């Protein structure tokens, strides 16, 4: 989807030789594949593709305009990204900012723990590219469906609610501090905000705040420039909902 390539998952396909070399149509909008379509189906699909292209052209005419509802309420329309390559589409489509930068993909795309400098360059590029627009970066959310070999995590019966995201960061503080140092440094170059995932207690928030203060003190002592990014939590667990009440 990110690359604008139609794709299907889990769709049964005829895999015998009878389909070899035949024309196929992949309809990613409703999860259908047509093998050797007749003229009527082919014409209908071509018409739909033309209509989709016209819709995209129409949306591009809205670039630079504010998002306002009929009753005058302004809406902030942000984009989600997984890596720095996605920034081109964000800029092309005139997003108001980045609502979620999934920083775990920086880890998943490498065979080693990303260094502070490696992360700093990526976050800095995102901040500078967005040119004053808000960039909300989620701290490492590894675990569950996002496994990383070099993390050497133990197998769990229920990894979705196990040691993942902020729990890993708090049990492996050096990894967390490295990321926070990179984030605070990059925040001096743009409007970066930091979001902490899978929070379930006030105690975790207090632990995070203590580590953040350590990081800021360390940067100041070393004479390294850093900003003052917004910070918040991702409300995604029942405990977080009840706690926020």
Where are these regions (language model features)?
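Conserved alpha/beta-domain cores
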Residues: 56-245
